[in-house]
A protein has these predicted regions:
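Juxtamembrane inter-helical linkers in multi-pass membrane proteins
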Residues: 480, 484-488, 541-571, 646-670
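Transmembrane helix-loop junctions at the membrane interface of multipass transporters and ion channels
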Residues: 600-623, 787-797, 818-829
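Conserved C-terminal guanine-recognition region of P-loop GTPase G domains, centered on the G4
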Residues: 231-297
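Hydrophobic core segments of alpha-helical transmembrane domains in multi-pass membrane transport
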Residues: 454-465, 527-532, 610-612, 625-639, ...
Length: 829
């Protein structure tokens, strides 16, 4: 019995050990990315999520087997910053919880580094001639016959216009390159159906060569408007060539997009940008060998220093004119992981060949997108039921053989190819000076206790310089110029004996109306100068990282903070600044919430009424108005989140670029575009609106010129609206007239009241302090000025603009009525 007891005890002990091992293994297997500690390394084992979100994870390089290091958390604990394949990436904790990882010990991390170094050394030693490739000048046009073989050429007829697509990741210098290639020969517009900027430019020295600057993207998956726009442009407009710019300091990440562009089988040139930084930090890239491995021309450039641009243009013109498609479209073979992915891709290509040709989609590109479950491609191919079943069977078989799901298998295939070619062609630089500088700056600008004070300080400085120093000074000069021109024109019209109505139209309608709006131009240009400096330097990405958590609680993202803050200065640039937001949902919400941030044009109204009715508590009243606007904005954000903008929150997967000094040419080009855009609106929509307001103020219902504004159509309309405001305590028609004039420009409210009432004493006879408080709340919240509404119309369309006008007026009425009602209940008068 003792022997039996001992055997049983040993069995129990062994079973406990086995159970403990199982528990430990289960724990390790189920460890997620969000459980990592700062500085901890791990290997991705499972990528969770579904649909576009999961595909975006994979596109950004988060695939099984990838090593990640948790760099830090945002000051408020969410999101986190990761280092993946040498670049920084942000991820929310909720999204990180969908990614399972396996912890890497310090020893394992060192072994991985040694192994990676050995692989790089092996790749460098594969071909001794490649060791000296960096010393060999890059081949010129026609040399070597590598890409200019007569057999590969399909020349276009002479005189055929050449069109190019300029594509690349965000923050890779694409805009700088576009400006260098085109100079001032640019046209800015929108892609059809979306509010994504489209820039077209004529290549300098090539009158019949047009290049389109496509949005910065990371892949050709239909994850964002930018990616859809890029893909549809290439597939439908069929440019004669693609210029793909990549950041040479982060080449692995950038080549992921390159491979997908090559699958489109369009003549293509690769521009290796920032090669000067690579060399300065002790690294190099064997350009000739990279060309051989990719099968496309590769041109080293520095867009910021205007180096290599002429050679890039020459190669681009050549491959487009002779239609030299990429020599390589296959990035895996039958030896890669048993050939599962290779067989799958080629099997699908055989299956869908005719459909792809009919749909105008390159067959290799279509096959890969079908494996990734791209529904847009599947719909365009119009496969029948049997073909779809066969497609699913081929993909399922590949998943079993490869041991990865379909989307992960394709992403792994691409990144595996990238790692192989980089091992042979890239000599790793030391940690760059730019990265070292960025890490030091981030210790302060994204530090736990310093990030928010720094942000507040920077924005306060921007606002002070814009609205009190530089912008205000330039605005004052422009106002003086407009006033001078108005006076000169007025005297000229009087001297010429021009008809009084025409005189009034020119002076009161055009000069005073359009002139009042034009005076905002210096403010907008100055503000966008600072915003572009912050954006191009990489700081705005850090602001989004820091502010994401509090804004996400009300349905926004970290990127919303800057447009909303700009809205305190002026709603127009606030709305325009929202264009930098990648999410259409967040962009719309941000635009709709911007009017709740009290703009500086309303400040004269606050000062006027607080001085007249609340002289001893003016500061408290004004601060209260700003706070009320923010609180109501938060409330509306929550309502929007539960009604108009329901659905899954857009993940915060964003690359944090190194800090860089923005190029003067790029900043200048941006400021010119913004100024030109504003001027175009000032002399179109705003011009028409001012004429309408002038007409209503000048004529009565019988179209007779009025001598007293009380008889005008505007006064008639105001008298009809007056009963609407009676419950709020300000039912006088003159108040209604001022509010209507405020639709033109908020500064007009005080000016109109001064004209109609004469002095403050007359206003005190009509309004009680309670009614004045109610009126202040209404002015805080009612419809923005015509310039702001025009901006909203341009960004969101007419329906949203009209809805904003009506919605803001309704919200303002309800809030003002609430203030009036509460005042009456507590005995105020």
């Amino acid at each position: 019995s003792m022997l039996l007891t001992m055997i049983i005890n040993k069995i129990i002990i062994k079973s406990d050990i086995i159970l403990l091992i199982i528990i430990i293994k289960t724990y390790e297997a189920n460890m997620t990315l969000r459980e990592l500690k700062t500085g901890q390394s791990a290997t991705v084992t499972v990528v969770g999520g579904e649909g576009a979100l999961r595909q975006h994870f994979l596109d950004m390089g988060i695939i099984p087997g990838t090593r990640v290091v948790l760099t830090k958390f945002a000051p408020m604990g969410d999101p986190m910053e990761l280092n993946i394949n040498g670049y920084e990436l942000t991820l929310r904790l909720a999204d990180a919880g969908r990614i399972e990882v396996e912890d890497i010990t310090d020893r394992e991390a060192a072994e991985c580094e040694v192994k990676a170094a050995a692989e790089r050394a092996e790749g460098r030693n594969k071909d001794k001639t490649a060791e000296n490739a960096a010393l060999i000048p890059h081949p010129g046009l026609g040399e070597g016959g590598k890409y200019h073989d007569k057999k590969a050429e399909h020349p276009l007829p002479k005189g055929t216009p050449l069109t190019f697509a300029l594509a690349g990741n965000q923050n890779c210098g694409k805009t700088t390159l576009f400006n260098q290639m085109t100079g001032s020969n640019q046209h800015v517009g929108n892609f059809p159906g979306v509010t994504v900027d489209r820039k077209d430019g004529v290549i300098r020295g090539q009158d019949k060569a047009l290049v389109t600057d496509l949005p910065g993207i990371y892949s050709m998956s239909p994850y964002s408007n930018e990616e859809i726009v890029t893909r549809e442009f290439i597939l439908r407009e069929k440019p004669k060539g693609i210029i793909n710019i990549v950041d040479a300091t982060n080449i692995e990440r950038n080549l992921f997009l390159t491979m997908q562009l090559m699958e489109l089988d369009v003549p293509m040139v690769l521009a290796l940008n920032m090669m000067d930084e690579v060399r300065e930090n002790g690294g190099t890239i064997r350009v000739n060998q990279l060309e051989e491995l990719l099968g496309i021309p590769v041109v080293p450039i520095s867009a910021a220093k205007n180096e290599g641009i002429d050679e890039l243009i020459s190669h681009s013109i050549h491959v487009a004119r002779y239609q030299e498609s990429p020599k390589r479209l296959d990035f895996c073979d039958e030896n890669d992981h048993g050939g599962a992915v290779h067989r799958c891709i080629h099997g699908i290509m055989d299956l869908i060949g005719d459909h792809a040709e009919k749909a105008g989609i390159p067959v290799r590109f279509a096959a890969c997108k079908l494996i990734e479950s791209d529904q847009m491609v599947l719909k365009r191919l119009e496969l029948d039921e049997n073909e779809q079943e066969m497609l699913e069977h081929i993909i399922t078989q590949m998943e079993k053989e490869r041991g990865l799901d379909r989307a992960a298998a394709i992403a792994d295939m691409r990144y595996s190819f990238i790692r192989r070619i980089c091992a042979q062609t890239v000599v790793r630089p030391h940690e760059s000076k730019e990265h070292i500088r960025s890490r030091k700056m981030d210790q302060v600008l994204t530090g736990k206790y310093t990030a928010i004070p720094c942000f507040i300080g920077i924005m306060a400085l921007v606002f002070w310089l814009t609205f009190n120093v530089i912008g205000a000074f330039l605005q004052n000069l422009l106002e003086q110029l407009i006033s001078f021109l108005t006076t000169v024109t007025d005297h000229a019209l009087v001297s010429a004996g021009v008809n009084g109505v025409l005189h009034s139209l020119i002076i009161n309608g055009i000069f005073n109306g359009v002139g009042s709006v034009l005076s905002f131009l210096p403010i907008i240009v100055t503000l966008f100068f600072f915003l572009s400096m912050m954006e191009d330097s990489g700081y705005i990405a850090r602001v989004a990282f820091v502010m994401d958590k509090p804004l996400r609680k009300i349905g926004l993202s970290g990127r919303s903070i800057v447009p909303l803050l700009v809205g305190f200065g002026c709603t127009v640039p606030g709305v325009m600044a929202s264009r930098t937001m990648p999410s259409e949902r967040d962009r719309k919400m941000t635009i709709l919430l911007t009017p709740f941030m009290s703009c500086s044009a309303k400040l004269p109204i606050y000062v006027f009424f607080t001085a007249a009715f609340f002289p001893h508590s003016a500061g408290i009243v004004m601060v209260g108005l700003y706070v009320l606007g923010v609180l109501l904005g938060i409330l509306m954000a929550v309502i929007y989140r539960k009604t108009l903008f329901q659905g899954e929150a857009v993940p915060f997967v964003m690359e944090l670029p190194n800090y860089r000094m923005p190029g003067a040419k790029s900043v200048g080009q941006l400021l010119w575009e913004k100024a030109k855009d504003f001027l175009q609106r000032a002399f179109t929509v705003i011009f028409i609106a001012t004429i309408i307001i002038w007409f209503l103020q000048t004529f009565d219902a019988h179209l007779n010129v009025v001598s007293d504004s009380q008889s005008s159509i505007l006064a008639l309309v105001a008298s009809l609206l007056a009963p609407v405001f009676a419950p709020l305590g300000f039912g006088d028609w003159r108040i209604s007239t001022a509010l209507i004039a405020g639709f033109m420009a908020k500064e007009s409210v005080v000016a109109t009241l001064s004209v109609l009432f004469g002095d403050v004493a007359s206003i005190r006879q009509v309004l009680t302090p309670l009614a004045a408080g109610s009126l202040l709340v209404f002015c805080l919240l009612y419809t923005p000025c015509i310039a702001a509404i025009t901006s909203v119309k341009r960004e969101l369309g007419s329906k949203w603009a009209i809805a904003m006008v009506i919605g803001q007026c309704v919200i303002a009425w309800i809030a003002a009525y609430g203030v009036h009602l509460i005042g009456v209940l507590v005995g105020l008068s």
